[in-house]
């Protein structure tokens, strides 16, 4: 359910305007990251660049934690019908994809 506010490097409204992702969906992703002890969640791809289309998927990369549970629940328990493409950075990742994540990624959550 969409409640609460997002605490992110970007202001809430700025994040929504750039990515087109509702504040509540970002908050749900953050809560799942905390639940499954994920260390870091990065938004990348067209939504991070701001050149997404209405039905563009949400590309996420993450490090640490219980990745299988996190990936499954993000797909099943967030308040959006958009598809997710989720990359586990603790597994082998193509160099080009890793460069793209590092270049354009927006950190949504980082455990301190």
Label the predicted regions.
Residues 1-40, 48-54, 63-112:
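Catalytic core of pol beta-like nucleotidyltransferases
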């Amino acid at each position: 359910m969409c409640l609460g506010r997002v605490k992110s490097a970007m202001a809430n409204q700025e994040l929504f305007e750039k990515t087109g992702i509702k504040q509540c969906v970002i908050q749900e992703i953050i809560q799942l990251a905390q639940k499954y002890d994920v260390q870091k969640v990065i938004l990348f791809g067209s939504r991070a660049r701001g050149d997404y289309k209405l039905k563009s998927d949400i590309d996420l990369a993450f490090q640490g934690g219980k990745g299988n549970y996190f990936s499954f629940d993000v797909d099943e328990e967030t308040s959006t019908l958009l598809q997710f493409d989720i990359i586990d950075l603790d597994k082998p990742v193509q160099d080009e994809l890793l460069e793209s994540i590092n270049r354009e990624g927006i950190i949504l959550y980082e455990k301190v």
